[in-house]
Regions:
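Loop-to-helix entry region of an early transmembrane alpha helix in multi-pass inner-membrane enzymes
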Residues: 78, 82, 86, 97-121, ...
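Transmembrane-helix motifs of polytopic, lipid-linked glycan transferases
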Residues: 110-131, 169, 173, 329, ...
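Membrane-interface transmembrane helices that cradle and orient dolichyl/undecaprenyl
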Residues: 129-131, 170-187, 197, 221
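Catalytic lumenal/periplasmic loop and adjoining terminal transmembrane helix
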Residues: 29-36, 84, 257-260, 265-274, ...
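Short helix- or helix-capping micro-motifs
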Residues: 140-145, 194, 198, 211
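Transmembrane-lumen/periplasm boundary regions of multi-pass, lipid-linked membrane glycan transferases
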Residues: 53-58, 77-86, 95-97, 196, ...
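Short acidic/glycine- and proline-prone juxtamembrane loop motifs at membrane-interface regions
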Residues: 39, 152-162
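Transmembrane-helix signature of polytopic, membrane-embedded enzymes
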Residues: 19, 123-146, 165, 181, ...
């Protein structure tokens, strides 16, 4: 059983400010969610959701629903859970699947944002339960919410960002399970949250597994129950913990339609597929070179983390690690009892978050795992890294105990840094997801940027605004233009024609090529002239419009209109 709350200061103000911050984010998100373009994976994710929804509806209600010709049983992506995306298709169903394409994807943007906002709320509640006072919890909430890459991606990235939010749910579920141990209504709630997390990404099984392992370690070693109650009591406790784990597996099957027909077989297939994932054979641009996704250098993830996380976050993460190292050095003569004290007290949350943050990265490096663009597939470790940083902040404040002005300067500096990030987000909107820290910004041309091809939407809208021709003929250019179709109003979509070619012929009369900066920015296309560059507010190049020379001369006299 967990002891009484460790909150030393129960000030009302941090909780009020946290509620106001979440409300402000909700208002801002409500009025900006339509500002973001449509990315390449959004259409794929919707297709997966339709296939799962069709199967679930037919299985539960015995009625046909013709949404896709692809049966779920043989669908290649059936092991990717989409339960948290189902409500968007339910809304489509209520309208008879007659919603305009743009409204469908804007609904998904809003829903993704709301899921991420719920993750932020759960993260704050988790921090309240594991840190020494609520001011640290408020700081953690703002550090996570105002991380620029996350703010921009929480509308369009319905996979990685939703999984990040689900991991925040899982952190809270872990805290609730330990605080209310033995109360099955809390175990059921935690099992459901764990199941939704694992449904979103199979690595979500890490949280209930760590919880089970901790309970066994606690009852068997740290506070051995068999010393007082004998082996029978220990095995009774072990059975109870195993039952909680089994409850989570049952919930996972219930929320995963693809597992309904054969749960055990599906679980085995899922673990086999993702233990050696090598389906994706794309290429990644990293530090000026192209690599296959399954042959990246070992330092790929560490470098991306160091270039795209604010430097002051990294500094406090190092402070947290330094504080832990200092504790180990101080306790080296009585390390066993010190570790026991840590694992039974607030320090266990530092250990948990450190494991969740380090283990997946270490596994990816050691197993040479296939990795996608950037580090988006590891976004779920960021809340845990924030917790490590918060322990660093807490350690520094303890070092400054009794020194009023240094503590005030540190607190004021943190507030100023967070305010600066909020201003940066507003300045870069709607391209805040391309954030790099000053070191990363200095070498941005050596890294992938718009690998989601989101800027294509803005570029097509710009072409439609400038060129009033009846037909706007585009090159497909790595399929990036097709998702943008779903953003266009019907009258605009009727003007746009897309061809799978980079060359003008009678059969492929393309006038425009949109080149996204997913690699070197020196792309050239014979017979086409670069006419417009889309850049972020900080000057980072996102994409370039190329126009066929003859069309440029005919429509604009050889000079693209400057606005």
């Amino acid at each position: 059983m967990e002891h009484a709350s460790i909150l030393a200061r129960k000030s009302f103000w941090p909780r009020l400010l946290a509620a106001l911050a979440l409300l402000a984010m909700l208002i801002v998100g409500r009025y900006t969610y339509r500002d973001y373009g449509i990315t390449v994976d959004e259409t794929v994710e919707r297709d997966s959701t339709l296939i799962n929804y069709q199967y679930a509806f037919q299985t539960l209600f015995g009625r046909d629903l013709s949404l896709s010709d692809q049966p779920l049983e043989t669908y290649k992506d059936r092991h990717y859970g989409v339960t948290l995306q189902m409500p968007t298709v339910m809304v489509e169903h209520l309208t008879g699947f007659t919603m305009p394409s743009r409204d469908i994807y804007m609904l998904r943007h809003l829903w993704t944002f709301l899921l991420c906002l719920s993750g932020l709320a759960c993260f704050y509640l988790f921090l309240e339960r594991v840190l020494s006072n609520r001011w640290y919890a408020l700081l953690g909430l703002l550090m996570l919410a105002l991380y620029p890459r996350f703010w921009g991606e929480q509308f369009t990235n319905i996979k990685d960002m939703v999984f990040m939010a689900a991991c925040c749910w899982a952190l809270l579920a872990t805290a609730l399970s330990l605080r209310h141990e033995g109360k099955w209504r809390w175990e059921i709630l935690s099992a459901l949250l764990f199941a939704l997390c694992a449904n979103t990404r199979v690595i979500g099984f890490l949280f209930p597994s760590l919880l089970f392992g901790y309970r066994v370690l606690r009852d068997g070693v740290l506070t051995p129950v068999w010393k007082k109650g004998g082996a029978r009591r220990f095995f009774a406790q072990l059975a109870k913990h195993a039952l909680a784990l089994l409850l989570m597996l049952v919930c996972y099957v219930l929320v995963t339609p693809a597992a309904w027909a054969s749960p055990l077989t599906f679980l085995i297939e899922t673990f086999q597929e993702f233990s050696n994932y090598n389906i994706w054979n794309g290429t990644v641009y990293f530090l000026g070179d192209w690599y296959s996704g399954n042959a990246l250098p070992w330092y790929y993830l560490p470098v991306w983390l160091c270039l795209s996380i604010p430097l002051w976050y990294l500094a406090f993460m190092l402070a947290g690690a330094a504080g832990a190292a200092a504790f180990v050095l101080r306790s080296r003569r009585r390390l066993g009892s010190a570790l026991r004290r840590v694992l039974l007290g607030p320090g266990r949350w530092f250990v948990l978050c450190l494991i969740v943050a380090v283990l997946p990265v270490a596994a990816a490096i050691l197993m040479h795992s296939t990795l996608y663009n950037g580090w988006r597939h590891m976004y779920f470790i960021f809340p845990e890294l924030v917790v490590v940083a918060l322990f660093g902040v807490q350690w520094l404040f303890r070092l400054l105990r009794g020194r009023r002005w240094p503590r005030r300067i540190l607190a004021g500096g943190l507030a100023a840094l967070l305010a600066g990030q909020a201003c940066w987000i507003g300045w870069m909107h709607p391209f805040e997801k391309f954030y790099l820290n000053p070191v990363g910004q200095s070498m941005c041309d050596l890294l992938e940027k718009d690998y989601w091809y989101e800027s294509t939407t803005a570029q097509i809208l710009h072409i439609l605004e400038v060129d009033d021709s009846r037909r706007i003929c585009l090159s497909v250019n790595a399929f990036s233009s097709i998702p943008a179709f779903n953003y266009l109003a019907a009258k605009d979509a009727r003007r746009v024609y897309i061809y799978d070619s980079y060359t003008y012929t009678d059969w492929t009369p393309i006038d425009y090529i949109i080149d996204e900066s997913c690699g070197p920015v020196s792309s050239t296309f014979p017979g086409f002239t670069p006419v417009y560059e889309l850049r972020c507010a900080n000057g980072m190049l996102l994409s370039t419009i190329y126009m066929r020379d003859e069309a440029l001369a005919e429509r604009f006299g050889g000079q693209w209109p400057q606005q």
